[in-house]
Amino acid sequence: KTHMHSNINMENQKSKIKENMSNITNKVVIMSGKGGVGKSTLSVNLAYGLSMRGYKVGILDADLHGPNIPIMLGVEGEKLTDLSVPYKINENLCTTSLSFFLPSTDPIIWRGPQKMGAIMEILENVVWGKLDYLIIDLPPGTGDETLTIAQNVGVGTKAIVVTTPQDVAL
């Protein structure tokens, strides 16, 4: 019975995620093979550029270990009480990050299921509304967060892979 209940909850969650993603015209994941190559910088600059052109843009900070988007947007330390409402930066730009809901700036030390659960909760509960673009800033590599996003955000998602010319970054 528990297994069946678990499957029903998962199907409900996936249905809600699909519904949330259906109002977003373009989904773009920003990824890399290693850290420190400029993913978050590109995510913020791309989002700002699109929003300045009049597009409605959201940034999802999916890097649970190093959530830099709030820092780069100048909203570090802001605390939200409602997971479903993204933080409004300006008329056309909003963001959400797990760091808005954590009690401190201590690093997160979570195993795969905890990370996947947090990502799924964000995807399920954040109500972006109608967006032209959702920019998803991923952590480095192809770990649990990246796989969870890839499996749940939907068909037609575009990817930008950021790298530097060093062998270790390729």
Where are these regions (language model features)?
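Conserved, well-folded catalytic cores of nucleic-acid-processing
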Residues: 27, 31, 53, 72-76, ...
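Walker A/P-loop phosphate-binding motif and the immediately C-terminal alpha-helix
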Residues: 27-64
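Short, ordered loop/turn segments at secondary-structure junctions
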Residues: 35, 62-64, 100-101, 140-141, ...
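Extreme N-terminal, non-catalytic leader segments
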Residues: 1-37, 78
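Short glycine/serine/threonine-rich phosphate/pyrophosphate-binding segments
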Residues: 39-45, 66-70, 141-146, 169-170
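Phosphate-binding loop that captures ATP/GTP phosphates
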Residues: 56-58, 62-109, 116-121
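Predominant activation on well-ordered alpha-helical scaffold segments within soluble catalytic domains
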Residues: 44-47, 51, 70, 116, ...
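Conserved catalytic-core segment of NTP-binding enzymes
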Residues: 125-128, 132-133, 139-170
